[in-house]
Regions:
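HIT superfamily nucleotide-processing domains
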Residues: 1-217
Length: 217
C-alpha cells in the first residue's frame, strides 16, 4: 500500500516540507504549492487523519483553532480582508474522495476572496451551520462528502453537502474562475487548468517562504 504523500513528505522532509512556516505539536503550516489567492497556506496535521471530525474526535480542535486565529490575526494586522478557511471533506464511508487531491487532513486559508462564500451559498442549498467545534463534534460527522468553509470574520462554520459528490479541487476552480487578470499574472498561472496544482511544476522559492513567514510569525 502506498504511503500518503503528506505523511511521506513530513517524514522524509522533502520538497516544500523542509520549509514549514509555523508549527505546533500536532500541526504544521506550509505555503500552498500553487496559490489561488494573494495569500494561500495549508494547515496540515502531522499524524494521518482524514477529515475535520477526526481532529475533533481526538481532541485537537483547541490547538487547531489557536493556529487558525493566530494566522487570521496576523493577516488582519497586515491589512488583509475577506479571509476564508476551507476543507474538501471526505466522509469515511464515502467511495469518493470529497474533492481532496490528498486524503490527509489539511485546511486551506486564503485571503482577499470576497466572492467565495457568496458563490457557495448561491450554488448549494444543502448547508449545515455550526457555531462552534463543540456543535460539530456532537453532530459526529456527515455521511457524504462535504465542503467545510468558514469566513474567519465570524464564528459560523458552514458545511456544504453534495449528494452527487464533489469535483476534485472544486474550490480551487472557483477561486481561479474569480481571479483577476492582474492577480493571475502576479501568481504566474494561466490556462484552462491553471487551478490544478498537480499539472504545475511551480517551485516554492525561499523568497516566497520569506514573504509568508513575515506575515505569519
Amino acid at each position: 500500500m502506498n504511503e500518503c504523500v503528506l505523511c511521506e513528505g513530513l517524514k522524509n522532509n522533502r520538497e516544500i516540507f523542509n520549509r514549514p512556516l509555523y508549527e505546533t505539536d500536532n500541526f504544521v503550516i506550509f505555503p500552498d504549492r500553487l496559490p489561488m489567492a494573494d495569500f494561500h497556506i495549508l494547515i496540515v496535521s502531522k499524524k494521518h487523519y482524514i477529515n475535520i471530525w477526526d481532529i475533533l474526535n481526538v481532541g485537537l480542535e483547541l490547538e487547531l483553532e489557536k493556529i487558525i486565529q493566530h494566522v487570521n490575526n496576523r493577516l488582519i494586522s497586515h491589512g488583509y480582508k475577506n479571509i476564508v478557511l476551507f476543507e474538501h471533506g471526505k466522509a469515511h464511508k464515502s467511495e469518493t474522495n470529497g474533492g481532496k487531491s490528498v486524503e490527509h487532513f489539511h485546511v486551506h486559508i486564503v485571503a482577499e476572496v470576497p466572492l467565495l462564500m457568496q458563490t457557495l451559498k448561491k450554488s448549494h442549498s444543502e448547508i449545515i451551520v455550526y457555531n462552534s467545534f463543540d456543535e460539530m463534534k456532537k453532530a459526529q460527522g456527515v455521511l457524504i462528502d462535504y465542503l467545510y468553509v468558514r469566513d474567519l470574520s465570524s464564528s459560523v462554520m458552514s458545511v456544504f453537502t453534495m449528494e452527487n459528490g464533489i469535483a476534485s479541487q472544486y474550490i480551487r476552480l472557483l477561486l481561479y474562475s474569480q481571479m483577476s487578470k492582474t492577480l493571475a499574472e502576479k501568481l504566474q498561472i494561466t490556462g484552462e487548468y491553471g487551478f490544478d496544482w498537480k499539472t504545475h511544476d511551480k517551485v516554492i522559492t525561499p523568497n516566497i517562504v520569506d514573504f509568508y513567514k513575515k506575515i505569519i510569525i
